[in-house]
A protein has these predicted regions:
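4′-phosphopantetheine-dependent carrier domains
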Residues: 1-174
Length: 174
């Protein structure tokens, strides 16, 4: 029902579907639809709690953290709020320029966040990311977007320092 007013305009090319889903009617945004899945909010909260436990013993050492394409500013804010009193270098990456710009707008008040492009479907050699340099990689519902999720996880592992930690949650079909 919510999509019906936009369908004609999207099909005829007079409306950009991404704008409809992400700007015109936020109730249609995929991240809003995800919140309706039973257990989704609890899963995100669990990830945030794990991050809290991880940083408890490391407040003096600056942490290098990278978040991969969450595309949900509310979740990123939860994460950044946990890190408020922690020495951290935080990088938010996405494979889409559109979503990276949206994240920059949504998170403009967080000065410690850097924004970079990263496409896990391309060779890591051709991208600007420093390999083996992150203490923590955070991925919330992002890796399933890759054609080859196993290869994407291998590339994520290349970002981690030795003994680095991947905090990840993703939807799977059972």
């Amino acid at each position: 029902k919510k999509l019906k007013p936009y369908l004609k305009h999207m099909v005829t090319g007079n409306e950009v579907p991404l704008d409809v889903f992400y700007q015109k009617d936020s109730a249609l945004a995929p991240n809003m639809l995800l919140r309706r899945i039973p257990g989704y909010e609890e899963t995100v909260e669990r990830l945030v709690q794990e991050l809290k436990l991880l940083i408890e013993g490391r407040r003096k050492e600056p942490l290098q953290i990278i978040e991969i394409g969450t595309r949900d500013a509310a979740i990123t804010r939860q994460i950044l709020n946990v890190l408020e009193d922690v020495s951290v270098a935080y990088t938010y990456v996405d494979s889409s320029k559109y979503f990276l710009q949206e994240a920059e707008k949504e998170l403009a008040g967080y000065e410690r966040v850097e924004f970079e492009m990263l496409n896990l479907e391309e060779s890591m050699d051709k991208q600007q990311m420093a390999l083996h340099s992150y203490d923590v990689v955070i991925s919330v519902n992002a890796l399933h977007r890759n054609i080859d999720a196993v290869d994407a996880v291998k590339k994520v592992a290349e970002l981690l320092k030795p003994n680095g930690i991947l905090l990840m949650t993703d939807l799977v079909v059972r």
